[in-house]
Amino acid sequence: MVFLKFLWMGFFCYLCQGYFDGPLYPEMSNGTLHHYFVPDGDYEENDDPEKCQLLFRVSDHRRCSQGEGSQASSLLSLTLREEFTVLGRQVEDAGRVLEGISKSISYDLDGEESYGKYLRRESHQIGDAYSNSDKSLTELESKFKQGQEQDSRQESRLNEDFLGMLVHTRSLLKETLDISAGLRDKYELLALTIRSHGTRLGRLKNDYLKV
């Protein structure tokens, strides 16, 4: 009877020798995290891993307890899923920042593809404005010379009919002086505009050369 008990206990221990009753821990294989899942629950050394189910998840269970201090630190540690979640949020935030930067750059470029094209367009516009200002200034100078020539002709006629044209000459001279004052103010304004355009053109040229 005792022999049968020992025989039964030996057979039971033999069956329990291949039983694996513990958590599945992650293992590294070709750089990937995976679990070996044994469907029949009988863990043996000759089990084929390819026939086992492959689960891409990491358990939160620890292999062995390391004291109360390790438990407190494990509460602060993140699981792999939480780390992936945090990383995904950081990637989304970085994407939003890059999108905002691209929008601000597109606003600065005013529809152009690059700063070089934007500066070339601005240079062309400034050049056109400068040429138009120069043309307007030339026309005003020619009108001013014509007014001076007209004044000289009127003065030469005074010698022929001084008494009859005295009043008319005075009124014409006053009108001419008013026109001259107005043209002088416009001339100074255009000169300031041209200098401002020249300064801006030089600054944009330097910025373009730096780019």
Swiss-Prot record:
Q: Which UniProt keywords apply?
A: Disulfide bond, Endoplasmic reticulum, Glycoprotein, Golgi apparatus, Secreted, Signal
Q: Does the keyword Protein biosynthesis apply?
A: no
The family database entries (Pfam families) matched by this protein are listed as:
Fibin (PF15819)
Positions of glycan attachment: N30
Protein location: Secreted; Golgi apparatus; Endoplasmic reticulum
Tell me how this protein assembles.
Homodimer; disulfide-linked. Seems to also exist as monomers.
- Family matches, as InterPro entries: Fibin (IPR026772)
Keyword Cell cycle listed? The answer is no
Major localisation:
secreted
Membership in a protein family? Belongs to the FIBIN family.
Position of the signal peptide: 1-18
Q: List the record's Gene Ontology CC terms alphabetically.
A: endoplasmic reticulum; extracellular region; Golgi apparatus
Q: What is this protein called?
A: Fin bud initiation factor homolog
